[in-house]
Structures are given as C-alpha cells and as structure tokens.
Amino acid sequence: MANTWWELQILCEPDLEDSIFWRLEDFGCRGTASENKGNSSLVRAYLSTIQTQLLDLAALSLWLRQDALCVGVSSPSLQWQLIDEEDWATSWKQYWHPQEIGDRFLINPAWLPLPETTERLVIRLDPGVAFGTGNHATTQLCLESLEMRLSEVPQSFVGNSGKHKHLVIADIGCGSGILSIGALLLGAEKVYAVDNDPLAVQSTISNGLLNDISSERLLPALGSVDVLTKLLEKPVDGIVCNILAHVIIELIPEMSAIAKPETWAIFSGILLEQSKAVADALEQNGWVVATLWKRKEWCCLNVRRS
C-alpha cells in the first residue's frame, strides 16, 4: 500500500500565522504553505501517517489553541484529511508563490518560470521536506540581516567577481539551504552548511544546483558544529543559525570554538520571550548582541565577538 499523508488545514488570524509555522515545523511537518482567506490566513501542512496518529493531531490542535490563548487571539480551526503520496508531493506547491524579501531578494519556486525582468537576487527554491521557504518570519529576518551585514563589507574586500574576498560563513541547521544560497548570492566566497537531517542536506545540495552554485562554494554536510570543526581549515568570518532557541543555547560554546575575534553571527528561531536567555548565554561565551530585530513574536539577534 502506498504511503499516505495527513493534509492539515488551519484557519487562523494572521497574527498567529508565524507561531503556527513554528509549531508545525517543531511537530515534524513536511511542506507548509499559506494563503489569505478574507481577513484570515489558511495554513496547509503535511505529515506522514507513518509518524503521526490521530491522537497526535488532537494534541497538536490543543497546542495551537494554547498558542492562540498566549498571543491573545481567537483559537484556530484545524481540519485534516488523508491524501496519497503523489498528491502530497504536488498539492502544497500550488499555494506557494514568488516572494520578495528585504530590499534585494526574490524567492522563486523552482517549478515556476523566472521573472523576465528583476533587479533582485533570485533564489530558486524547491524545499521538498526541508524547512525554509521564506514564508516564516525568522527566515526573512535572517535574509535581511545577511543583506545588511554583507552590504557593509568595505569595497576593498570585494573582488572583481563581486565575491567578498575569502569571506567564509557557516550555516548551522541549513534546512533547504535558503540562507546559504542567499549569502553566496550576496557575494560570500564559501558557505559550510550543516544539518542533522539528511533530507535537509540533500535539499541544500539540490537547491545549490538549481541556483548554479558550484560545489566548491557551497559545502553541505550531515551533522552539527562538531562536524564543522573537522571540515574547517580556520575559523569562519560569519555564522547564520535559524533553529530553536534552546538548541542555540546548547551550541553556543561549540560555535565560539569556530569563531575568531572578528566573527559576526546571526541567530533566529527565537521567540521574543526567549531572547534574554539566548543573549545571556551569548554574553557568557564572549559574544555581544549588536542589534535585535523583531517581527511579530519572533526576533533575530545580530551579534559579534566581544
């Protein structure tokens, strides 16, 4: 019998959408998309029936109601149905459209034609089962932070090719590879991208090829910071990390080991209420928070070595 999937449809207030994306990603959903429905948002997500039972969906419904209560909005409506594998592979894609992020990026689904004219940096993306489509506030904040950070590099550090000379970045928890590709399109010379999920590593490789990025510039690997310590010849110039706050806190000492005095970092996946705990852990390990950007209940920390 072919594998089947749960298709979830969540009708919610727009203010709850980012929180729902985070909850779904943490729950293990494979592929998410959203669209406007009048004054509401309709979020679609997909879960394998091999990993998820009806009781799990009931628990998810309860957590979503609790999240709405914390935010102070009305409870979302959650419905689900079974669909075949073939339907899952294509159904969510019809709801995902090109999206401008920041001043320079355009996220373009790989199955749609490229725009005929645009001055933006186009990231072609097929996330598959990996996290990172550009829909989530944390991904947007990270791309905008990269845009700001790499635009600040002095022109003397930029070669004739447009690449920032010797600028090496680590992408920890790379997901679809969207942040790695964004950094490379902005001119970084090389990105080491790691993720504990082999499907995410494969997604990063595939999306790198979609964007004509050579394997010498984008180096994905299975694992975490411990793998980077073996791959890197020297400390990195920058770090991007868009994962859950408690994981960031656990990894900060290891990340400090791959940094040098001039290294900067961008951290997101952090709820506003978690920002102090992350900032405290950073300061205890020789980092200082330069700026905190927020979008709804999420934030992004731009930091540097102290």
Curated annotation (Swiss-Prot):
Keywords: Cytoplasm, Methyltransferase, S-adenosyl-L-methionine, Transferase. S-adenosyl-L-methionine binds at residues 139, 173, 195, 242. It is found in: Cytoplasm. Its main location: cytoplasm. Its EC number is 2.1.1.-. It comes from the Bacteria. It is an enzyme of class 2 (transferase). One of its GO terms (biological process) is methylation. InterPro entries: Ribosomal_L11_MeTrfase_PrmA, Ribosomal_PrmA_MeTrfase, SAM-dependent_MTases_sf. The keyword Membrane does not apply. It catalyses: L-lysyl-[protein] + 3 S-adenosyl-L-methionine = N(6),N(6),N(6)-trimethyl-L-lysyl-[protein] + 3 S-adenosyl-L-homocysteine + 3 H(+). The keyword Transferase applies. Pfam families: PrmA. Methylates ribosomal protein L11. PANTHER family: ELECTRON TRANSFER FLAVOPROTEIN BETA SUBUNIT LYSINE METHYLTRANSFERASE. Belongs to the methyltransferase superfamily. PrmA family. This is Ribosomal protein L11 methyltransferase. It comes from Nostoc punctiforme (strain ATCC 29133 / PCC 73102).
